[in-house]
Design a protein with these regions (language model features):
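Conserved acidic residues
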Residues: 185, 231
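Short glycine/proline-enriched coil/turn segments at helix->beta-strand junctions
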Residues: 206-207, 229
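Short amphipathic alpha-helix with an adjacent loop that forms part of the alpha/beta core around
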Residues: 218-229
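Catalytic core of soluble alpha/beta enzymes
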Residues: 215
Length: 236
């Protein structure tokens, strides 16, 4: 394990361990103190959430999310109407009573990669506030480094997201914002996707999901396009 609170190395050495992980059996999960951030909340993220909850007098289900916009989207999807959304520096704490909505809300947070990062939590716990000028300089440097690896893409056109699934969810939402007013609400899934990508389409309430299992079946896609209601084609 790297000597860092942000490091993640997890071994599930036996099939029984894998089954215990998937079934969330306590005997397995008591040994898992770190993991892929969307599936296992980093200890620093949990500490930041607890500290903010104490500050605002909140309890129940606690979700430290990257932005108010992300919080509003997920609250609407999960039909949570009794939540508090408290600003905490450059992120927000969403809290609401434990209940039937807790698990679906948590799942959609997972699908969208909207939790704050462990480094963001660490900065908050250390009392380091976000500096907009420093953030802008850091983003400029990241874009400059990435630009040579992305053909014909200007640095200003590179959008940096919180995480991989966060980028996917944001991209789908952006396309929907453009296509929905045009009456285009059908998404074609071409081939099998990573599970969270699939769930974004399956759980959407304002779009239709069409699954073409064979990634080479371009003919199936071409037969759907003339209908004029396709918002996009998604494949991985």
């Amino acid at each position: 394990m790297p000597a860092s609170p942000h490091g993640t190395v997890v071994s599930l050495p036996t099939l029984a361990d894998v089954e215990g992980y998937e079934r969330r059996e306590p005997a397995t999960w008591k040994h898992i103190t770190a993991g892929y951030p969307r599936f296992v909340r980093n200890a620093l993220v949990s500490q930041a959430a607890q500290q903010a909850a104490q500050q605002f007098g909140r309890s129940g289900s606690l979700f430290p999310l990257a932005s108010r916009r992300a919080a509003d989207r997920i609250l609407a999807w999960a039909h949570v109407t009794d939540a508090h959304v408290d600003p905490v520096g450059d992120w927000v704490l969403v809290s609401f009573p434990e209940g039937p909505a807790s698990e679906p809300f948590a799942k959609f947070v997972q699908h969208t990669g909207a939790l704050i990062s462990s480094r963001q939590a660490e900065a908050h716990l250390a009392g380091r506030s976000a500096d907009s000028a420093e953030t802008a300089r850091a983003l400029e440097q990241v874009r400059a480094v990435l630009s040579p690896y992305l053909a014909s893409v200007k640095p200003a056109d590179i959008l940096v997201a919180l995480a991989g699934m966060n980028a996917v969810a944001a991209g789908i939402a952006a396309v929907n914002d453009v296509q929905r007013p045009r009456g285009k609400r059908v998404w074609i899934q071409l081939g099998w996707l990573y599970v969270d990508s699939t769930r974004l389409f399956e759980k959407a309430t304002d779009t239709q999901h069409v699954f073409v299992p064979d990634v080479t079946d371009i003919g199936a896609v071409e037969r759907l396009l003339p209908q004029g209601d396709v918002a996009g084609v998604f494949t991985e």
